[in-house]
């Protein structure tokens, strides 16, 4: 009888040890964030910059960056405003301190690009104002869903940025500058 009891106890111990819950070690928040950042893919798009030789030409520049969850047109607009040209043949025509407030794209193909008031900085001259307006417009119209661009300052339509070019109505792509 003792052998039977001993055998039963041994069998119960083996069964009980196999029933413990196997919980994998939890990943801490820092490792999870690092893994998520590493999984982000690269995105690329074209922004247009003024030719530095004053030839009234906009030159395409390919920008690559990590996907941040924003739309490609919004990333392109932000890159146009926040990055400097990588080629000496290109000039940055965006006034210092300008920020993108928002970009909204309507179903009719009109993009509303809203900037801080620094975009309308005085003293750009007619050439600078034209190149700025069409750098924005041609960058955004690279995307097939955008047909025209309404430039806004602090959420409102402006008649002009610095007194030379009418931007009260949406602008369309200017291929003569390309």
Each language-model region and where it sits:
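Bimodal "functional hotspot" detector
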Residues: 2-178
């Amino acid at each position: 009888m003792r052998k039977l009891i001993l055998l039963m106890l041994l069998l119960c111990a083996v069964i009980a040890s196999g029933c413990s819950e196997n919980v994998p070690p939890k990943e801490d928040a820092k490792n999870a964030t690092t893994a998520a950042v590493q999984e982000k893919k690269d995105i690329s798009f074209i922004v247009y910059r003024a030719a530095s030789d004053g030839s009234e030409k906009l030159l395409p520049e390919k920008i690559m960056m990590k996907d941040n969850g924003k739309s490609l047109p919004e990333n392109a607009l932000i890159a146009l405003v926040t990055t400097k040209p990588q080629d000496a043949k290109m000039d940055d025509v965006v006034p210092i301190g300008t920020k993108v407030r928002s970009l909204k794209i309507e179903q009719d193909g009109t993009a509303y690009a809203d900037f801080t008031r620094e975009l309308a900085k005085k003293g750009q001259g007619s050439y600078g104002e034209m190149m700025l307006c069409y750098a924005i417009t041609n960058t955004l119209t690279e995307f097939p869903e955008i047909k025209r661009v309404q430039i806004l300052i602090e959420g409102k339509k402006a008649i002009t940025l610095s007194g030379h070019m009418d931007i009260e109505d949406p602008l369309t792509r200017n291929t003569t500058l390309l």
